[in-house]
């Protein structure tokens, strides 16, 4: 999957918008690939729903197995949602090993506490300190054996601590080794976040009603 990683890295840093629809299994991966998308997104939340459990109950190996099944059947670059990293930095290292071997093109981690609280699904975030998250990001960055594997750092701070705090956290995560910043915020805040963070910006939308040009304008 080195070629998929390289293609994804080039797409991310190429300056255009990259769309990554939800992919949960080989069939959906093939559909997304045949439809011409540049990447797919293996969501922890959606995978938990598929298994009829909360994302908080998923294990490293369950997610890695799902990723491996997808990447074994298609060449689509796959973003793997690593949730909160399954514990401390040492657990993040194990996760990177597993996801990299499973063919991930990028791995996303977020700054919620571990184990992840199910309150996230009703809009309540329980965040770790910036220093704790930076330690996880640094561990992830150092653990990868393929430099083309992207580390995506996501913050939930904007919901409850404000946009400025979210931006400050994201820039700290980038300094710690994250390649891409992910913000979960209102559409109207995305342009500000993009202009004030020093890495490509990613976000999640459950019902995308924007055109590619509108996403470019957001940054």
Language-model-derived ranges and their functions:
Residues 2-218:
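Alpha/beta enzyme core
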């Amino acid at each position: 999957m080195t070629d998929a990683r390289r293609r994804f890295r080039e797409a991310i840093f190429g300056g255009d918008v990259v769309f990554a629809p939800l992919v949960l299994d080989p069939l959906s991966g093939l559909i997304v690939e045949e439809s011409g998308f540049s990447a797919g997104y293996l969501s922890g939340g959606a995978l938990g729903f598929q298994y009829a459990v909360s994302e908080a109950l998923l294990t490293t190996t369950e997610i890695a197995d799902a990723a491996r099944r997808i990447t074994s059947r298609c060449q689509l670059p796959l973003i793997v949602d690593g949730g909160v990293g399954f514990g401390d930095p040492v657990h993040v290292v194990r996760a990177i090993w597993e996801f990299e071997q499973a063919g991930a093109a990028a791995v996303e981690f977020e700054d919620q506490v571990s184990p992840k609280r199910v309150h996230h699904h009703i809009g309540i975030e329980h965040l770790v300190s910036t220093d704790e998250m930076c330690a996880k990001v640094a561990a992830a960055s150092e653990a990868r054996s393929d430099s083309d594997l992207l580390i995506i750092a996501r913050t939930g701070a904007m919901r409850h601590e404000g946009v400025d705090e979210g931006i400050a956290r994201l820039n700290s995560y980038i300094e710690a080794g994250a390649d891409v910043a992910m913000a979960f915020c209102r559409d109207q805040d995305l342009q500000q976040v993009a202009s004030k963070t020093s890495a490509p910006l990613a976000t999640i939308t459950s019902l995308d009603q924007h055109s590619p040009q509108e996403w470019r304008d957001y940054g």
